[in-house]
Swiss-Prot record:
Similarity field: Belongs to the class I-like SAM-binding methyltransferase superfamily. rRNA adenine N(6)-methyltransferase family. RsmA subfamily.
Biased composition (Polar residues): 1-15
EC numbers, comma separated: 2.1.1.182
Protein name: Ribosomal RNA small subunit methyltransferase A
Entry-linked InterPro entries: KsgA/Erm, rRNA_Ade_diMease-like_C, rRNA_Ade_Mease_Trfase_CS, rRNA_Ade_methylase_Trfase_N, rRNA_adenine_dimethylase, SAM-dependent_MTases_sf
Gene that encodes it: rsmA
Disulfide bonds listed in the record: none
């Protein structure tokens, strides 16, 4: 692991040297706790030939210890000041296979970073909390070229992504993410591990895209619509939701029976498989 020191003071000094102020619109909170950094890197279990992509490297607190574990690495950084600072500090001279993409993570075509030679992508990052969900959904569209993803987000969002069916935190994000990926909650990160400290506690989690989905929706866009619309009315029964919704068809008792779902059930009691069966039946009714 890199011997570079990252602590609150060194982060502050580096920001001053780069004449950079953390930008709220980019959701910039810089990780500095070395024990947390070590734990994150170890949890990823990297191999030398991994095709590693880091989103939002910031000051490089994770970048350098990650780079010490692999032969090549690409980072995506929107903030040009930080990207330039990384290029100067790490540079192509000491790491010829280190590439910086100055771009919004939402605008990157991740398929271009994949090749048979380089292999599937292993994506990591401390995502900007204010746009984390859109980035996750963008990455899901490249799931076929991604081996796994390790991200740090607000703890409450990670709890929703990894929630078990029937729990209070189980919802739309749980169903959609678990439809596409296996999810693992890895570790909790306290506010003090960052400079400046965020207002919320963070957590690290893993997403591993299914090579073969356990269940397959006949129309994935419609499946997402059913999940979204039902959880928008999570206190109502499924019968009531489908009866009153302007976006979904009314389902009969036979329709619910066809997918082995109780019409009196509420959305949080349905598994991913239940939602797939429900959306397939609703799509059939709608024609």
């Amino acid at each position: 692991m890199s011997k570079t020191t990252f602590d609150a003071q060194s982060i502050t000094n580096s920001l001053r040297a780069a004449k950079h102020q953390p930008r709220k619109r980019f959701g910039q909170n810089f990780l500095h706790d070395r024990s947390v950094i070590r734990e994150i890197v170890e949890s990823i279990r990297l191999e030398r030939d991994d095709n590693l992509i880091e989103i939002g490297p910031g000051m490089g607190a994770l970048t350098e210890p990650l780079l010490a574990e692999v032969d090549a690495m690409t980072v995506v950084e929107l903030d040009r000041d930080l990207a330039d600072s990384l290029r100067i500090r790490i540079g192509a001279n000491s790491h010829p296979n280190f590439e910086i993409i100055k771009n919004n993570a939402m605008h990157v075509d991740y398929r271009e970073l994949y090749s048979d030679e380089r292999g599937k992508l292993r994506v990591v990052g401390n995502l900007p909390y204010n746009i984390s969900t859109p980035i996750l959904f963008h990455l899901l569209s490249y799931a076929d070229v991604i081996e796994d993803m390790h991200f740090m987000l607000q703890k409450e969002v990670v709890e929703r992504i990894t929630a078990d069916v029937g729990s209070k935190t189980y919802g739309r994000l749980s169903v959609i993410m678990q439809y596409h990926c296996h999810t693992d909650y890895l570790l909790t990160v306290p506010r003090g591990a960052f400079n400046p400290p965020p207002k919320v506690t963070s957590a690290v989690f893993r997403l591993t895209p299914h090579i073969i989905k356990p269940v397959v929706a006949e129309d994935e866009e419609y499946f997402a619509l059913v999940v979204r619309e039902t959880f928008n009315h999570r206190r109502k029964t499924l019968r009531a939701i489908f009866k009153k919704s302007t976006l979904l068809p009314t389902l009969s008792e036979d329709d619910f029976a066809a997918c082995a779902i109780d019409p009196q059930a509420r959305p949080e009691t349905l598994s991913v498989k239940d939602f797939v069966n429900l959306s397939n039946q609703a799509r059939k009714v709608e024609g």
